Amino acid sequence: MSTGKIIQVIGAVIDVEFARDNTPKVYDALNVVEAGLVLEVQQQIGDGVVRTIAMGSSDGLRRGMEVKNTNAPISVPVGHGTLGRIMNVLGEPIDEAGPIEYTEKRSIHQAPPAYDELALSTEILETGIKVVDLICPFAKGGKVGLFGGAGVGKTVTMMELINNIAKEHSGYSVFAGVGERTREGNDFYYEMKDSNVLDKVSLVYGQMNEPPGNRLRVALSGLTIAEGFRDEKRDVLMFIDNIYRYTLAGTEVSALLGRMPSAVGYQPTLAAEMGALQERITSTKTGSITSVQAVYVPADDLTDPSPATTFSHLDATIVLSRQIAELGIYPAVDPLDSTSRQLDPLVVGQDHYEIARAVQKVLQRYKELKDIIAILGMDELSDEDKKIVDRARKIQRFLSQPFHVAEVFTGNPGKFVSLKDTVASFKAIVNGEYDHLPEQAFYMVGSIQEAIEKAKTL
């Protein structure tokens, strides 16, 4: 084990000098013995000097401190010992429940599976959320992105997906908290505990208060644990909240490493970093990883380089819209912006496909008519258009749904709606079978039966 010494500290970036013939490799983990800090090598500068990122606070470091090379990348424990535990980026327990028992540790830097090992699946995962199941269904082993600006409900929608899928799902789940609020991580832990599914979940946190090195690598640590379960022939659910903070941590580190920024100040290696993470989140012939990723959209601009780079890696995109949230419709999913590769007659069936498209057609026509209504009022519309507006407003309200995870705030019990009920209900609304009901009856209900019951009380 070769030793070197710190020669420069700039925030989270630390330069370490080793003997020239013992220079550490890129991605090797180094230990600052006195401070108990782990560094990860990012660049070899020359003459035995390496530039590293600190996986923790660099407070108290000084020049001349001794650094040991572990001759291996950062490794985290994988397997059953991680279930029910909260770990940090290094795979160390942070839940004060004793050491983690493990038989294997894996490097957080792995090559993605080879092309001939990949497996495709068209089996649809039922989420119980009407708008998701109808407009952007997702497959087992697929990748789903939840896009939205600040405060439109990404985390709540993700928690509901976890609630509906992970609790019904017999396999294991991995949750990676990347640069999000510690409070949310805490709430999530206790929620899993209360619903008795904690023994099926591994939690890896690198939250907002952590240095950029932790936030940059914590997604990889979580993914390594998920890959471990996948290689045991299991179906794994992988939740990442939030992928944007992974990009942001890369941006913070990139400037300190001396790279020239590219568009909007992002790191020039944005696409490569995103690809390195996303290409590993995939299903093989041994097992599947189904991932749900929250993606923060800066200033509600979907063309920002970070969300735009993420788009290309996903099978389904659920776009949350501020305009819909302002109408009080939650989940605030935009049915015209959200897409899924699974919305194909060969996958979901002709009936489902046609109804989803009919719903989008009605909503699109309503969107076009809004300008006319704003200028001339409803009276100037033809009878046919009036009918479309009426149905569109009912559809819009019926796409809202009370969530189980929001029950404590709203007082409305959460609803799980089966895919069969969802498709049948929207078919009836589009065909005009419920034209006689007031639109308010469709707001915040589960099935169409509840809307009929609600109409009686209005």
Curated annotation (Swiss-Prot):
**UniProt-listed SMART domains:** AAA
Which InterPro entries does the UniProt record give? AAA+_ATPase, ATP-synt_VA_C, ATP_synth_F1_bsu, ATPase_a/bsu_AS, ATPase_alpha/beta_chains, ATPase_F1/V1/A1_a/bsu_N, ATPase_F1/V1/A1_a/bsu_N_sf, ATPase_F1/V1/A1_a/bsu_nucl-bd
Name any one Pfam family assigned in the record: ATP-synt_ab_N
As recorded in UniProt, its EC number(s) are 7.1.2.2
Gene Ontology cellular-component terms listed: plasma membrane; proton-transporting ATP synthase complex
**Where is this gene product found?**
Cell inner membrane
| Molecular function as annotated in GO | ATP binding; ATP hydrolysis activity; proton-transporting ATP synthase activity, rotational mechanism
- Report residues binding ATP: G148, G149, A150, G151, V152, G153, K154, T155
Q: What is its main location?
A: membrane
Q: Which UniProt keywords apply?
A: ATP synthesis, ATP-binding, Cell inner membrane, Cell membrane, CF(1), Hydrogen ion transport, Ion transport, Membrane, Nucleotide-binding, Translocase, Transport
Which catalysed reactions does the entry list for this protein? ATP + H2O + 4 H(+)(in) = ADP + phosphate + 5 H(+)(out)
Membrane topology listed for this record: Peripheral membrane protein
Oligomer and partners: F-type ATPases have 2 components, CF(1) - the catalytic core - and CF(0) - the membrane proton channel. CF(1) has five subunits: alpha(3), beta(3), gamma(1), delta(1), epsilon(1). CF(0) has three main subunits: a(1), b(2) and c(9-12). The alpha and beta chains form an alternating ring which encloses part of the gamma chain. CF(1) is attached to CF(0) by a central stalk formed by the gamma and epsilon chains, while a peripheral stalk is formed by the delta and b chains.
Role according to the record = Produces ATP from ADP in the presence of a proton gradient across the membrane. The catalytic sites are hosted primarily by the beta subunits.
Q: Which family does it belong to?
A: Belongs to the ATPase alpha/beta chains family.
**Protein name, per record:** ATP synthase subunit beta
The gene for this chain is atpD
